[in-house]
Amino acid sequence: TYLELAKELHGEQPVIEANPPPARRETIVVIDFGSQYSMLIARCIRECHVYCELISHDVPWEKIASLNPKGFILSGGPFSVYDPGAPLPLPYVYESHLPVLGICYGMQAIVRQLGGEVISGTKHEYGHAILHISGLECPLFAELPSSLPVWMSHG
């Protein structure tokens, strides 16, 4: 929250409840599509003092609802969205009207499901790169610089 951020900036450590009851806990749900980095994504979220759960892409809403989700992160994976039987996010991801962040395959799945086209790049993407962010007005990216070094692993 903004209050916790302000306290951190002024040297006061916010009180973080280690394991609040599920009814009060706000959860980011990381939906795993088979990425080798899914557990790393979840760990990084937790290191930011945000509770998250890593779940398989086929977990039904009935099991998700009890987690009190506040947003979804769709992981990467080894698939192409054009592969027959490629896993896609279940409808609740969109029907919930919660924020969704797609990473790699997760973003491709969003684009495909919402009627967009995913095309192959002209070269393999592996190694250090510079990410240029457009949309800094979005709260998710507001405190980031307009460009930053990243690691890519597509190929």
Question: Predicted segment positions?
Answer:
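Short, solvent-exposed beta-strand edge segments and adjacent coil->beta transition regions
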Residues: R25-I28, H128
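Conserved beta-strand elements of the Class I
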Residues: T27-I31, P99
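Flexible inter-domain linker/hinge segments
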Residues: T1-R25
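A short, well-structured beta->alpha microelement
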Residues: H49-A65
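Cysteine-nucleophile active-site neighborhood
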Residues: M39, R43-H49, S66-E143, S147-P149
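Two-component His->Asp phosphorelay active-site signatures
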Residues: G34
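Short, intrinsically disordered, charge-balanced linker/junction segments flanking boundaries
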Residues: S153-G155
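The conserved SAM/SAH-binding core of class I Rossmann-like methyltransferase domains
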Residues: I31, I55, I103
